[in-house]
C-alpha cells in the first residue's frame, strides 16, 4: 500500500507549509499549490485522496471548481476552507472548514478515520 496523497491549495504560504508539516508527520504525501492553476495541475497529475481548497486565490475562486472536482475526482475527499463568508450547507459531498483551522479539528478528522489512512493500490 502507498501513502495517501493530500493536496493543499491555498495562497497563504505559511498555512501551506504548516499543513504539509502536520500531515507529513502522519505519513501522508503532501502537495502544496499557492494558485488555483497550479492546484488544478497537481490535482490532474497526482489525483490526491484528500484536497483542502481555499476560496480566495490570486487567480480565481477555488470554490468555483467544486463541481468539477466532485464529478471528475469522486473518490477524493474535498475540504473547502476560507476565512470569509462561510456558507451554511448540509451537503455530504464535501466539508467546509473555517480559518483559522484548529489543529485539534484536524487531529479529530485524522483520529476519527474521516481522513483516509492508506492508499490501496
Model region roles, listed by residue range:
Residues 101-121:
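C-terminal output helix
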Residues 81-82:
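Hydrophobic/aromatic residues positioned on beta-strands within the core alpha/beta folds
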Residues 13-31:
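Two-component/phosphorelay signaling modules centered on CheY-like receiver
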Residues 32-50:
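Acidic, metal-coordinating helix/loop segments flanking the phosphotransfer/catalytic sites
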Residues 54:
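Active-site residues of response regulator receiver
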Residues 58:
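The feature encodes the CheY-like receiver
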Residues 41, 63-74:
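Short amphipathic alpha-helix used as the core "switch/output" element in two-component signaling
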